C-alpha cells in the first residue's frame, strides 16, 4: 500500500484500499502492539460475538483494555463475524469491558474496521439500535481515557459506537462515514453505480476528516506490518500519556466539547 507521501489518491481508491483483503488483521494488531493479551468473552447477558475481540493487555508496561473489530481470516470465520459487522452482543461486550476498565482506571483502546453494525433480523430482534445508542451514551461519560484508531472501514453508527474517543486517529488507507458510497448513491441518486462519485461527496477520507477536525491525525501505512504496528503503538502511547495527565473532570469536559462541535 502506497503512503500518503507517495501519491494522492481518489476517494474511491481509498475506499478500495480500506476494504482490501490485504488490510492488516485484528490478530496481527493485537500481537504487534500489545503484550500479554488476555481475551474476555461474552456480554454477560446473551451471547459472545466473535466480531468483537476484547480483553486486557499491556501497552509497554501500562495495563489497558483493548477492543478490536474482527473481520475474520478464513471463510468460516468471516461468515461467523458477518465480515466484521458486530451484533448487539458485540457492542454490549465492548461496553462491559470499557466499564470494567473505568472501574480499575485502565485506558480503553479501540481498533475499528467495520462496514457497520450487522443489519440482519436477529440483530434487530435483539436490540441493535439500543445497543449502539447505549454505547454512545455511556462512552460519552466514561471516566477513563478512550483512544480509537480506525484501521480500515469506519462505517455508520456501527463504527461510531466504538469510536467515541477522546482521540480518534485513522490509517491513511481507511474511511469514516455515515454510510457506504454505494448506499449513499442508491438513496440519493437511485443509482448505486455512482459509488465513486458518492465517495467524493461524502468526504470520507482521512485527509478530508482531518481538515474538518473530526479526527486528530493520520497514521501513514507501510508494506511492513511490523513497521505499521510500531507507528500505531507510538501514536497510542503518546496520546495516552497526554490524556492521563488530565483530571477526570477535564477529560470528560474535553470529550463533551469535542463531539459537541460537530
Stretches found by the model and what they are:
Residues 1-186, 190, 200-262:
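Terminal-region recognition feature
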